[in-house]
Amino acid sequence: RDATRAFSLPCIEEPDVEADDIIASYAREAQRQGWHVTIVSSDKDLMQLVGERDGARIDMLDTMKNARIYINEVEEKFGVGPDKVGDVLALMGDSVDNIPGIFGVGPKTASKLIAEHGGLTAALDAAEGMKKSKLKERLIEHRADAELSRVLVTLREDCSLPVTLEDMKLDEVPPEPLAAFLGKHGFTSLLKRLEAGNGSPSRATDLNPAKPETAGAPASSAGNRQPLPEFPAVDRSAYECVQTLDRLEEWIARAMAARLVAVDTETSSLDCMLCDLVGVSLALGPNDACYVPLGHGGSDMFAERPEQVDKAAALAALAPLLASDAVVKVFHNGKYDLNVLARNGFAVAPVEDTMIMSFDLDAGRQLDGIGGGHGMDELASRHLGHTCLTFKEICGTGKKAIPFGEVPLDKATEYAAEDADVTWRLYKTLKPRLATEGGTRIYERVDRPLVPVVAQMERHGIKVDRTRLAKLSEEFAGEIARLEKEIHAIAGTEFTVRSPKQLGEVLFDTLGYKGGKKGKSGQYSTDQSVLERLSGEGAEIAGKVLEWRQLAKLKNTYTDALQQAINPETGRVHTSYSLVGAQTGRLSSTEPNLQNIPIRTEIGRQIREAFVADDGNVLLAADYSQIELRLAAHMADVPTLKEAFAQGEDIHSRTAIEMFGEVNRDTRGRAKTINFAILYGISRWGLAGRLGVEADEAQAMIDTYFQRFPGIQKYIVRTLEQVRERGYSETLFARKTWFPRIASKNQAERQGSERAAINAPIQGTSADIIKRAMVRMMPALEAAGLGHVRMLLQVHDELVFELPEGDVDAASAVIERVMAGAAEPAVKLDIPLGVDIGTGTSWGAAH
C-alpha cells in the first residue's frame, strides 16, 4: 500500500475478495478493451491468465528473476498450457495458499496426469482403471480434496471494478509523498533523481532526516507533536552476550536499580504454546543491551555447545526481576512474550507494550503519507530512522534456513539485543505522546491492562471433541455428496457444482431461470445474492447450491482444520488474539479464527457443540444483547429507540411498526436489516441488494428511517463532519481511529472511509466496553471466591467461561454485573446494557 500510494498508483481493496480475483478481473477487462497486460508477479495461480485473446496479450513479469512469463514459460513450468494450470495445482496443492491437493502427488506427477488425460475430472475418473498403486489409492481416496482445490485455485474474472481503467492512467506523480517514502526507506539515489527532476520538497517538514550521529524520527501527521527524543545511532557492536551467571546477576541488579527494562524473548518457533525458550534480551538504555542465550546448540550431537548460562540457574535469577512490582517491563507485542515466559514458569508484572501504544496513538493513521502498521521493524523505521536486522537475515530462508538456536552467538546477540534496544527507544518515544495526544485514557484503562488478560485466555484454550469434529466432517461429506446428487437430478444433467461457469449455464440456459446477468468475463454471475434471489423466487436448485457451498466451506475451514489445531500437549485449541488487528479496537482471532463460525444457523450450532467443557465443568456464554443498537440510541440520542429499550421491547419489531405500520415476519426481518445496515452507512444500492428491492424503493426506506429516527441522520452528519475536520473518529472512551482517505479524490476510497467512519464510534465503543469487562472480570470473580473460573474466549460481543457446574449461579451473577456495568463510571449510558447468559456442557448448548 505504502509504495503504490507514494507513486500515486491506485491501491484497490475489496472486502471478502481475494487479491488474485481482483487482478484477474482487471486483467481480463483490459484485455477485452484491447490492451496488452503485464501482471507483475510470480504467483502460480495467476499463470492461468497468460495468453492471447482477440489480439490482446496477458503476460507476467517475475521481478525476483527479472524474467517475463509467456505461454512457453508456463508450459515449461507445468507441462501444460495456462488453461490447465488450475487442474495441475488442484492435484499438487499449495501449502502457502492452503490448497490441500492430493497428498503425495507432486508437480511432475500432476503435470503428467493432466497432460495425459486432458483435465482434472478425466484424470480422476481414470484412476479406477489404473493398476494397483499408491497413486491410484490416493486419487480415489482424496478425489474430493482435489475437486475442492480446483474451486480454490479458480480465479474469479467478474469482480466489480471500483476504479475504472481510465481512472488508472497516470499523468504525473506528486513529488512530496514520493519523496517522503523514498527518504523513509533509504532510497537515496532515487531521491536525488526525484529532486533533480522535480525540485526538492521541504526537507524540514517532509523528510526531516536524522543527524549523522543520531537517529531521530520523522513521524509527522495531522495534529501537533512534541519534539521526538534523539538517541545515539544503534551500535550493535555495543551489545553484550551474557554467558556467565555472574554477568547476568550484574545486569539484573542494574535493571532493578533502573526500575525500567525492555525485555524480548527468542524461541524455537512462533507457536508460543509449544516453543522452547532459546534466549532472553534486556535493554536499559540506547545501546545498553544484552542477550542471554539459554538454548543454543544441541541439534548436532557431535558439535560443542556454545558457552551459556545454565538455563535453570538463569531462570531462577530472572524470576524476581520479572515479578517485581517495582520494575516496569517493556515489551513489543507483549502478549506473545508473556505466554512464552509463563510456559517457563514466570509471572510478569507490571507490563508496558509499545505495539499497543502505537495502535492507540495511530490506528488507521498514515504518517508522512505512508501507512501506519505497528510491527517493530516498521515503527523503528518510522520513529527512529533505523532499519532493524530481519529474522531472514539471521536465520536464512528455504532449505538453508536454520533455527534461531543454531545461530552463532555473535549474530544472535546483534539481532536479539537490538530488539530490546529498539523496544526501549520506542517506549521513550511513544509514552510521552500518549499524554500529549490524548491516548493515555484508552491505553492505561483499557488496552494495557488487557494484555495479560488476553495472554491468560490464550493459555487456557478451549477443549474440543476430536471425535465429534471427525463425525461432523464425515456427515458434512455425506451431505455434500447427497446435495450434489439432488442438484444433478433437478438440473437433469451432471455438472461440476463448484464451477460458477457450469452452474450459470445450468441455471439460466438449461433450466431457463430469468434474471441471469453475464459479467465482463462472459459468464453468468452465480454469487450468493443471485442464488438467494432465485431461491426466494422458488428455485429449489439455488437453495441447494447455497447449502452445498456453506457445507463445503465449513468442512474445509472448521471441522477438518480444527482437528489439526488441537495442541498435542494440552488437547485444547489455543486461538491467538490480535489486539491491533481491527482499527476500531475490536479483537481479532486467528489460528484458528473462531469469530467466523456461523452464529444463528443449525450448522454453526453443530460446530459449537464440538467445543466442550472438561468433565464436571460447564461452559458459560455471556452475550451483550444488541449492544451496538443500544449505543446508537444513546450516541445519536434517539428517544423512540431509548423508550423501546427501556421498556424491554423487541427493537426490530418497534422499527417495523415505525417503518411499515405493522409487524410480521417479513417486516421485522426488513427492519432488522435496515437497523444494522444504516449504522454501517449503507448506500441505497447496498440496501437494495440486501432486501432484494429496487434502489429507489431502498432509498425511500432510508428516507423513512431518517424521518422516524431523525437523531440517526444527525449523528451520521455530525460524525462525518468531525472526521473530515479532525481526521479521526472517537469512541465514548476517547479511542481514536484515523481516516486518512476521508477526503480522497477516489470515490471508492472516500465512500469506503465514510462508511467506516460512521460505524467506528459505535463499534469501537462496543469493543471498549467488552474490553473493560474483561479487565475487571477476574478480579471480580476472585473477590467472590470464584478465582478458579476460567475466561476462555471473546467472540464478537460474547465472553465464554469454563467453571464447575455447582458455581453457575454465583458466577452468573458476578459476570452479568461486571458486563452490565462495564461502561461506568467513565460513561453513564442512557440505556442499560443487557446481558444474556446460557450454560451447557458444550458451547453450542450454552446458547
Residue ranges and their predicted role:
Residues E14, I39, T496-R498, R790-V795:
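Short beta-strand
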Residues I402-G405, Q456-R459, N567-A582, L587, ...:
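Conserved catalytic core of nucleic-acid polymerases
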Residues M47-E52, L270-D271, V280, K335-F346, ...:
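Short active-site loop/helix that positions an aromatic residue
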Residues L46-V80, K136-R138, C290-A312, A316-P320, ...:
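Short alpha-helix plus adjacent loop in nuclease-associated cores
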Residues E13-P15, T38-S42, A262, A326-G334, ...:
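Acidic beta-strand-to-loop metal/phosphate-binding motif
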